[in-house]
Regions:
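Hydrophobic transmembrane alpha-helices and their helix-loop junctions in integral membrane proteins
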Residues: 1-207, 211, 215-219
């Protein structure tokens, strides 16, 4: 799925490059539109993340949402903040996807959050590193995502885009909601997996947990 999606995104980007760049690019005219489109993308993708029960789909929509923040940064002229968020996002999103892989590994391939629950007792390292990733992407102080998102939102406000700022702030709240919904459904509450899956539950090997810990530290 990832290879197909990446291929489509690249093809689209290259086609748009070839069609639009020869005609010129007026920053003064286009920048506000880019900011609005970025804010709308961030918000819409966050609402889609709330509706998902597949752990990988939740993270996929969260990626689209965070890309929306980066477009907001470009639209309001906060290029450094956009690159900063790109870097922080690289670490906590790698952490979250690897953590999701560890969960799926423990669950013998199951990806449905509604069939999980109570996993913190069986995969504690994965649990705590996923909590760190959720805090980082939610923009909770003092984790990495707070500083990069705060810079983007402040730039939107100070450059005279209050609506973009408000949508970005609302999106941050939605992000926190669906990420901790993911953590809650997977790791907390009652166990909802079948007996056979429960019998094989185990923490991932060091080849997976060590990178999780390193990425968690880089997300602080």
């Amino acid at each position: 799925d990832g290879n197909i999606t990446t291929g489509l995104l690249r093809a689209t980007a290259y086609v748009k490059d070839n069609r639009l760049l020869p005609r010129g690019f007026d920053k003064a005219t286009a920048a506000p539109d880019i900011a609005v489109i970025g804010a709308a993308t961030a918000f819409f993708a966050a609402t889609m993340g709330i509706a998902q029960t597949d752990i990988k789909k939740v993270l996929a929509y969260s990626t689209v949402s965070q890309l929306g923040y980066m477009f907001v940064a470009v639209g309001v002229g906060a290029f450094t903040a956009g690159i900063f968020h790109l870097m922080t996002h690289a670490f906590f999103k790698a952490l979250l996807f690897l953590g999701a892989g560890s969960v799926i590994h423990a669950m013998s391939g199951e990806q449905d959050l509604l069939r999980m629950g109570g996993l913190r007792r069986y995969i504690p390292v994965t649990h705590w590193t996923m909590v760190v990733g959720a805090l980082a992407i939610s923009g909770i102080f003092p984790f990495a995502g707070f500083f990069s998102k705060d810079e983007i939102l402040w730039s939107a406000w100070s450059s005279g885009h209050p609506l973009v700022w408000a949508v970005g702030l609302a999106t941050a709240g939605l992000t926190a909601f669906y990420m901790f919904r993911l953590v809650s459904l997977a790791f907390w509450g009652s166990e909802r997996m079948d007996h056979e899956t429960k019998r094989h539950l185990h923490e991932s090997p060091p080849s997976m947990t060590v990178p999780l810990v390193i990425l968690a530290l880089l997300s602080l």
